[in-house]
Amino acid sequence: MDDDQQFCLRWNNHQSTLISVFDTLLENETLVDCTLAAEGKFLKAHKVVLSACSPYFATLLQEQYDKHPIFILKDVKYQELRAMMDYMYRGEVNISQDQLAALLKAAESLQIKGLSDNRTGGGVAPKPESSGHHRGGKLSGAYTLEQTKRARLATGGAMDTSGDVSGSREGSSSPSRRRRKVRRRSMENDAHDNSNSSVLQAAASNQSILQQTGAGLAVSALVTTQLSSGPAAGTSSQASSTQQQQPLTSTNVTKKTESAKLTSSTAAPASGASASAAVQQAHLHQQQAQTTSDAINTENVQAQSQGGAQGVQGDDEDIDEGSAVGGPNSATGPNPASASASAVHAGVVVKQLASVVDKSSSNHKHKIKDNSVSSVGSEMVIEPKAEYDDDAHDENVEDLTLDEEDMTMEELDQTAGTSQGGEGSSQTYATWQHDRSQDELGLMAQDAQQRDPQDLSRKENTAPDVASTAEIQRSFQRSILNGKQRDEQKIQLPGSRRKRLSVTEVSDMLFEFYKTKSAKVPKAEQPHRQVSPTSGEILDPSTISAIAVYGTASETASKNLNADEVMRVQNATATRVVGAAAGAAASFHPRPKYTLKTAASSTEHTTAIPTSVLVANSAAALTPKPQAAVIAEALMRNGLHNFQQQLRAQEILRQQTPHRRIKEENDVEIAGGDITPTKILENLLRKQQERDLRHSECENEPGYSTEDDEEGRYHAFDDIHLMEQSGGKFGNNSGMGMFNANAHGGSASSILDAHQAFRNLEFTLSDYGGSSSNGSTTSPNGIGLDGEPVYECRHCGKKYRWKSTLRRHENVECGGKEPSHQCPYCPYKSKQRGNLGVHVRKHHTDLPQLPSKRRSKYSMNRENGMSGSMSDDSQGKLIIDFNGKGELETK
């Protein structure tokens, strides 16, 4: 029995001890977990004490999951807050009489027990404007949107239309200024009946339900049906009475249905005015409610609420304007007061409906707000604002379809007429689509016209036509190929001055050099001369015309004419085809790429040809040509081949034209045993061949050494092609047949056909590597992305820009060859002499450097002191430098 005995331990001063401990903790700011702010000052407190002393704080703190929330109290002074804190922690506070009323009012708003338990109404509840973050902006991750809504519902007066939503609070009611402003709005609408307060209370209750359940897009189906189905003014009074009896019982109609049904209400002017005001109010409160639901800082909520209150006053004016638009018939219904009440109710409902629409939709509606309402006589049509909003349209299609089942056929007809903004709206949109598609097709057609399948025909055709031949003839005086101009040019060039010349000028000067300094060659006056359309230069038939295949050809090939222009010129001049050779060439290449135009002159026949086209001697069969020119042609034509093939081509030319060899030997005897151009070119070929054998010592890849950089560049004649006139390339019955016919007195049209067919064959057969007879490694294997030739190693497949680099690779690198160049000062070995030179200059600066192997690429020495050399500038042009002593030097 003794074991069952229990003792009661009582702490007599338990409550006083706890209260004193709380006070001590507050003074030391120990274990504080919330902050109250007023007038820019802060007081830290404990959540437990605040919840125990105030049901308002208890409800608010239950929804806050932040570790240390901050509550900003508006309309509460710091002295009043400090007094209430002392009252809650100590149970008593001393205050003066003049501050008593303000303290009691603040305590009533915060529902402090002992100060507001027995009081009801009159006070204004200040709201915390920011809850859930610290002073420095620290936010809580667990603070969700739903919790924010609940917290703001508990604050009371958070929304501008909120009524008495504090039913769960103990002993407190929170009437707000917003309610008084809404009442003032109803009085301005001349609705002095008792239904206003009930309508507003029903709207506020409905909004609280919408916010708690999250169904932001729901409104009353009964209200909207009554608003849209009334064909006369009397329907407004019926809708008003029905709404009062059944306030907001259904929440299944979406925003789009509301818009569609408001559109159909065009018969009653009073209903139209009310709908206009409702839609305008919806614009304002969409932004307000969106900002309210997104904001965490309650200060922003307060600011938005005040903005909404001011906006309500602005809406009052809009409602008055809507009534004025209705005209004198706006109150012709059976019950004008009820109609006005219906207008107010419609505005509240649509305002609640639009309060949860997203911000982008709100902005879109504001842009078209001014154009949304139109009135003709006694009718008013309201266009739905979100008709073309993709988000709202996709969201509400299903609900709209369900609600249209309740609409009559008349309503559907009325809705169909205005939902798309009138008849012209959809038709205009379809027309715009059609025009747009046509524009796209037109642009594609224009692009196709500008596009040309041939890469060389993309530039504008600048070849001169028949009418421009006179201008070309006038340019004869400016040509450097005339004798007087050439003499003046030689005189003007001093010994120390150097000039960059074009390919045509260089080729002409080269042949002139051969012609004047070698055996005398008889030259007869030719009946035909050829004029370049790009530079206006006169090309003598015996002149060696060169083309820079990779440079000038790519720049000037696009300046030629197309096939249609060729046919027009040929028909206009009534030309005749030059024998079977021209016919065979035309059939071989039916689509001409390069054409020319001719025009008859009173003095001499002139043929305009592009400089990019190779021209042969039109009198080659009559006038013997010096073998030097033939060898030069072979040299420059076969620049893409190795030099053994060039020598072989020279021998073939000598065998095919024995009379030229005899003639040249006779010329040598007449010249007194002078060295012929054949000797000069043979010497040139031998020097080139010897230099190829020593390419590992003379040539380096560009970039290794500045001293030996020029040795790695490609040779000048590699970029020059000359057409073989003896038929070695095209056959005896093709090119030579044409020019033989021209030499026997052919007309201008025959020259046109001959040159056209000859160019067709030239550009068909002289592709890169196409004229190579044996797969030589010195011929390009393809074309790179930049249009330059690519030399590919036949052993390992590596590709190089320069053929000299390819030869160096095959000799010193390909196949894992060991370095062959030994440094004389250290064990370093290099595969290239240029790298060895760089090594010596870098690591052995104080020791004797390696001797330079750099020399000119092409040199021509004469016994009488005449010498010359040619170089290239890597851009499709040759450079020949002269001095006053008649000597050619490499620049």
Swiss-Prot record:
GO terms for cellular component: nucleoplasm; nucleus. A zinc finger (C2H2-type) spans 791-813, 821-843. Keywords: Developmental protein, Differentiation, DNA-binding, Metal-binding, Neurogenesis, Nucleus, Phosphoprotein, Repeat, Transcription, Transcription regulation, Zinc, Zinc-finger. Pfam families: BTB. Residues 32-97 form the BTB domain. It is found in: Nucleus. The modification Phosphoserine is found at S140, S162, S168, S372, S375, S378, S696, S705, S749, S750, S874. It comes from the Eukaryota. Residues 449-462 have a biased composition (Basic and acidic residues). PROSITE patterns: BTB, ZINC_FINGER_C2H2_2. Residues 162-175, 228-251, 263-293, 329-340 have a biased composition (Low complexity). Residues 115-200, 228-340, 446-467, 840-891 are annotated as: Disordered. The modification Phosphothreonine is found at T161, T706. Signal peptide: none annotated. Its main location: nucleus. Putative transcription factor required for axon growth and guidance in the central and peripheral nervous systems. Repels CNS axons away from the midline by promoting the expression of the midline repellent sli and its receptor robo. This is Longitudinals lacking protein, isoform G. It comes from Drosophila melanogaster (Fruit fly). The gene is lola.
